[in-house]
Amino acid sequence: MHVPQAEQLGQAITSLRPRQIGAIPLVYPILADLGVRQITNDLVPTEADIDMGRIVLLLTLNRLLAPQPLYHVQDWLAETVLPQVLDIAPEKAYDNRLGRALDRLYPHLGELWARLASQAIQVYDLDLNVLHWDITSIYFEGAYTDSELAAYGYSRDHRPDTKQVNLEVDVTHDGYVPILYHTLPGNTADITRPLPHLSRPRC
């Protein structure tokens, strides 16, 4: 862990107010090594009091450690050491603000992922000679009538009553770090993907 990160976490932990620490000291340094905040801010600059990089860090940590809807992130944040670590007051992390941030981030997701993957390859000296590929699915509650991706299909979650989106992922052999991903309509058959997918890692 870098010294500034350790000092930030240490100051938060010594607070007299009880707060959740959990796996933050393990996960936060990895996000810092990957340069999540700086890469995000380079792609989506803002003059707001909370930069996009910190919002992405907050939402990433929430998704990894305690996944919940946007309207609960504010309450979760208040119970953790992250207000001190990220310098984000809980009252400023309301759901509409987080939603607008995600809308701004969406057009840049491909470039953001590419830069983060490149950073991970360099920082952790990942071996790309062998990649493992697989398809999974994520199901959604609701109609999603205007979605081009959400569709009924083979449900790996045993939820044939819900629409889903398929996700194909390539991970490294050493550590199973995700390097490439591609979203697919939920009714895509696995058997149709190997040949088209072979061209993607070479691009």
Residue ranges and their predicted role:
Residues 1-151, 161, 168-187, 195:
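Dynamic "connector" segments at or just before major functional cores
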Residues 191-203:
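Short, basic/hydrophobic alpha-helical segments
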